[in-house]
Every structure is written in C-alpha cells, then in structure tokens.
Amino acid sequence: MDSQAQPPPTFQPELFGKYFLIDRVATGGMAEIFKAKTYSTAGFEKLQVIKRILAHLSDNEDFVSMFIDEAKISVSLQHANLVQIYDFGKIRDNYYIAMELVEGKDVKQILRKLAQKRKLLPEEFAIFIAHEVCKGLDYAHKKTNLQGEPLGIIHRDMSPSNVLVSYSGEVKIADFGIAKAEMSTYNTKDGVLKGKFEYMSPEQARGEDVTQQSDIFSVGIILYEMLTGRRL
C-alpha cells in the first residue's frame, strides 16, 4: 500500500453496490482503501478490502487504464503469498477492486514498532519473511497465459509497506498497482519513476527498463532493513 497514505479523520459507513463499507483505512494520491463486508444469500458475512479510485481520477483515461491493468494482472494471480483479488468493476462512476483482508501488519509498521522499542526483528523471522516474499514473486514472475506464454509480470514497488504479515504468520505481497506485464494496455511514460526510490534497483532509479531481477534487488534491500533496523 502507498506509504504516503494517511487515515482521514472521519468516515461514515456507506453502501457501495453489494459492499458495505465499514471503515476507511487509508486515502492515498490515487485511491481510497476501505474495510468492507458482503453478505451471502444465506446471510453469511465476509470481510474484504475495497480499493476505490478517487472520484477526480475516474475521468482520467490513462489512469483508469492503469487501474484496470492492475485488476487484470492481480485477478490472474492465485498464490498463498499474494493478496487474493476477488472482483473488480465499476459501481456508478467509481472503479474498484475487491480483495482479501489480511488481518495483521505490514513490515514497515512492524519495523517502526521495533525501532521505538530499540529492538531488531529476530533473524529467523526476517529470513522467513524474505523467503515467503520470494516464493510469491517467483510464482508471479513465472506466470503464463493460457497459451503458455510468459506474462512478464514485474511488481516494481517491492517495499516494506507492501509486505503484509498476518497475525497467524502468513506473508503476502500487496499492491500490484504499478506492476508491469505484457498484457498491460497502459504504458509508463518515459522518464516517470514508479515505485519508492529508496527500495529501487539502480536501473529502476535511473529510469531504465526494469526486469524481474529488479524486484529481487528490492527484496534484498527489505531484508537488509529487517536484519539491521536501518535503511540501506
């Protein structure tokens, strides 16, 4: 999730199509993130996360195209180490993605809390988290279409805030919002950096073409930060 996102001061629960938005978790520069619930015909409740494009961006064709690409990429990915996408579409004038709710914290939050206590994340935990992240990336990097052709998926924004750790110990990669894949219809403009600069590979920081190895480089920076408590 966007590291700049800040929870707004107030929120009134609202009905959004079949989703009842319980709480607004964060608002970034491009979208709002909500905790929501849905009801089955039998009356069962299911908690989910809704990512909804900000109203003023809904008329931006380039951005909507990028958002739809994110949904197409994410829906095609089914792996234990990736946040699962359930649905995407448009309700009234709002585009949205419905995804798995991971009850837990992201690595950025975990490291910040440890720093406040002047403690380091135990080495075995750091290695476990990095290993699980690499499993998820390996799956995404090797994903093919129905014809067996590589999709060429690259996350491009691997950072502590996009690594979620559930209270039960699951590790999941979030936010393929700026992922690059051959199936994408939206092309990043030349010279425009996508991702968080401090976790970028050298080629990504220079605005050059990125590869799947760029994601792995970013994971190495995350692992360094988890082991040392310091940014590289």
List where the protein language model places each region:
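Protein kinase glycine-rich loop
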Residues: 21-29, 33
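Activation-segment/catalytic-loop signature of the eukaryotic protein kinase fold
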Residues: 88
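Conserved catalytic-loop aspartate of Hanks-type protein kinases
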Residues: 215
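Conserved short submotifs of the Hanks-type protein kinase catalytic core
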Residues: 92-106, 110
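AlphaC helix of the eukaryotic protein kinase fold
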Residues: 54-76
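Activation segment signature within eukaryotic-like protein kinase domains
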Residues: 129-130
